[in-house]
């Protein structure tokens, strides 16, 4: 494949934007390949400005659960645009999407719309602190909750240490109110609560970690979180920005049967437009302005285009949708294991609904430490060879791949064959 136009576009972009991009992963640095500039998408396919076609497993990092340019979404967006893009006042579309979310998500009795997943998690933590009157938040190593200061934290050397900033510009004073413990480790969480329990406002977790690859919870982990937070009077917060409506019809919380106090949503809820949301029990949500004194606002929150895209996306998802994802996922997982075994290359495949992650190690992978043992050099080689075969994968070991309703068995079989061909070139 040729990337002449993409390379030329990147040279210009680098003079205009830091690193030439508006989000770091788009620079493709971790796979040591030129950034690709996309032109358009349709169904399960995406096309770059050089005219190359790919089967797309990135799907805009998860939102496009119906694939690209879904006819129903696009048609209703045209109708919404004809009425205006934003009004600075409420519309009936907000009611429609809010009601649908409340009907589908077990923990949500009231919901507040925002414009991004980062906003959703940031506002949720403010609400948790304001509601409980406590300061500290517990997060898990390897879980990403957006780029707000208090969540850009890495673990120290201890089991349950106060956080250190993971980025310059994050004051240590903010970091000290974030406690980081290993994912899937209830013993570490218990130690954190024994030390700081009286000042822990809440525990925030991706019910399926999606930013260290795809790492599902081990049996009993989520219920353990529910039990411990209840015991100490802290709030359990599910960050379902990625898992929401991907893992199941009732999100991850419905799939696993564990109900948090607060839930953050994003990605799929916007169907490809900028949307986030957070919600939970009425008694907690009513503390937000204008009913309560915990402030939150947004100029474009609940804008009609985003509400339209979100509603028309979610309204097409049914329980049968997730049966289809499971069928495609079974085929892909079995094919990956078969092909990698054929070439004597170790692989660990983790799945949750339409989220799939593969690690180039023996496994298991249940936490960030184990995820980091994946062969990153081989992953980069694999990425480059798969792109040559017309398969667009996330250019990072620590991002998951996604399925859409537009993907077909033929797409999956072509992808498995592409892995076989790629490995034939890599493994001599």
From Swiss-Prot:
Protein's UniProt name: Glutamate-1-semialdehyde 2,1-aminomutase 1
Organism field: Staphylococcus aureus (strain MRSA252)
Top-level taxon in the UniProt lineage: Bacteria
PROSITE patterns registered for this protein in UniProt: AA_TRANSFER_CLASS_3
Subcellular localization(s) per the UniProt record: Cytoplasm
Gene: hemL1
InterPro entries according to UniProt: 4pyrrol_synth_GluAld_NH2Trfase, Aminotrans_3, Aminotrans_3_PPA_site, PyrdxlP-dep_Trfase, PyrdxlP-dep_Trfase_major, PyrdxlP-dep_Trfase_small
GO MF terms, alphabetically ordered: glutamate-1-semialdehyde 2,1-aminomutase activity; pyridoxal phosphate binding; transaminase activity
Family note: Belongs to the class-III pyridoxal-phosphate-dependent aminotransferase family. HemL subfamily.
Assembly with partners or alone: Homodimer.
One Gene Ontology CC term in the entry: cytoplasm
Upper taxonomic lineage: Bacteria, Bacillati, Bacillota, Bacilli, Bacillales
């Amino acid at each position: 494949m040729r990337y002449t136009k993409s390379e030329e576009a990147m040279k210009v972009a680098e003079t205009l934007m830091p690193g030439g991009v508006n989000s770091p992963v788009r620079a493709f640095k971790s796979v040591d390949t030129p950034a690709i500039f996309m032109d358009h998408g349709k169904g399960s396919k995406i096309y770059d400005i050089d005219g190359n076609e790919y089967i797309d497993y990135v799907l805009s990092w998860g939102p496009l659960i119906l694939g690209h340019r879904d006819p129903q979404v696009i048609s209703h967006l045209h109708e919404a645009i004809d009425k205006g893009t934003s009004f600075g006042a409420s519309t009936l579309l907000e009611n429609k999407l809010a009601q649908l979310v409340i009907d589908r998500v077990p923990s949500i009795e009231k919901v507040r719309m925002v414009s991004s997943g980062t906003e959703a998690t940031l506002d949720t933590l403010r609400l948790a602190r304001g509601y409980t009157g406590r300061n500290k938040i517990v997060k898990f190593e390897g879980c990403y909750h957006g780029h707000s200061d208090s969540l850009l934290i890495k673990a120290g050397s201890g089991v349950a240490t106060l956080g250190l900033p993971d980025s310059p510009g994050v004051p240590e004073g903010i970091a000290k109110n974030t406690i980081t413990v290993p994912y899937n480790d209830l013993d570490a969480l218990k130690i954190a609560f024994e030390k700081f329990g009286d000042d822990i406002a809440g525990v925030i977790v991706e019910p399926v970690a999606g930013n260290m690859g795809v790492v599902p919870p081990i049996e009993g982990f989520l219920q353990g979180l529910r039990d411990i937070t209840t015991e100490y009077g802290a709030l359990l917060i599910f960050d379902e920005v990625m898992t929401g409506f991907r893992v199941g019809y009732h999100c991850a919380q419905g799939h696993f049967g564990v109900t948090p106090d607060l839930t953050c949503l994003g990605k799929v809820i916007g169907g490809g437009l900028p949307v986030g949301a957070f919600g939970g029990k009425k008694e907690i949500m009513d503390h937000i302005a204008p009913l309560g004194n915990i402030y939150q606002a947004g100029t474009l929150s609940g804008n009609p285009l985003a509400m339209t895209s979100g509603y028309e996306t979610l309204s097409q998802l049914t329980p049968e949708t997730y049966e289809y994802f499971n069928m495609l996922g079974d085929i892909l997982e079995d094919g990956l294991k078969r092909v990698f075994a054929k070439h004597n290359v170790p692989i660990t495949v983790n799945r949750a609904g339409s989220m799939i992650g593969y690690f180039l190690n023996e496994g298991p992978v249940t936490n960030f430490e184990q995820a980091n043992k994946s062969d990153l050099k081989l992953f980069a080689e694999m990425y480059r060879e798969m792109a040559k075969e017309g398969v667009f994968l996330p250019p990072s070991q620590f991002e998951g791949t996604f399925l859409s309703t537009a993907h077909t068995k033929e797409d999956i079989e072509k992808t498995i064959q592409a892995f076989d061909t790629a490995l034939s070139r890599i493994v001599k």
